[in-house]
From Swiss-Prot:
It holds the Pfam family DUF525. One of its GO terms (biological process) is error-free translesion synthesis. This is Protein ApaG. Residues 2-126 form the ApaG domain. InterPro entries: ApaG_domain, ApaG_sf, Uncharacterised_ApaG. The gene is apaG. It comes from Vibrio cholerae serotype O1 (strain ATCC 39315 / El Tor Inaba N16961). NCBIfam families: PRK05461.1 (NF003967). It comes from the Bacteria.
Amino acid sequence: MDVSLPCIKIQVQTRYIEEQSNPEYQRFVFAYLITIKNLSSQTVQLMSRRWLITDADGKQTVVEGDGVVGEQPRIKANDEYTYSSGTALDTPVGVMQGQYLMIDEQGESFTVEIEPFRLAVPHVLN
């Protein structure tokens, strides 16, 4: 990341939602909880997101849109924003990765990369 850009840290927690899944019909539902930490000295705003979701068969789905969960949150300096969402896969294992497009107080846009993270039914992977 360019040192002139705000320092943004992304933390992800995932969970398999057994009660909404139906393995017999190849439907595996996962929730993810994301915390966006603004470690910079200025307020930033999340404008849009782009996800690349890949299942174990290599099927890829791109999800793009404004903000997250219907919001374009402003995150103050040294503050954080947490939200949860979910996705369904055709396989018990998959990977998500993506980007957030954000703007700083001067209206300059920058991209925050979201490193790949695993979605997996418990005990499927050793």
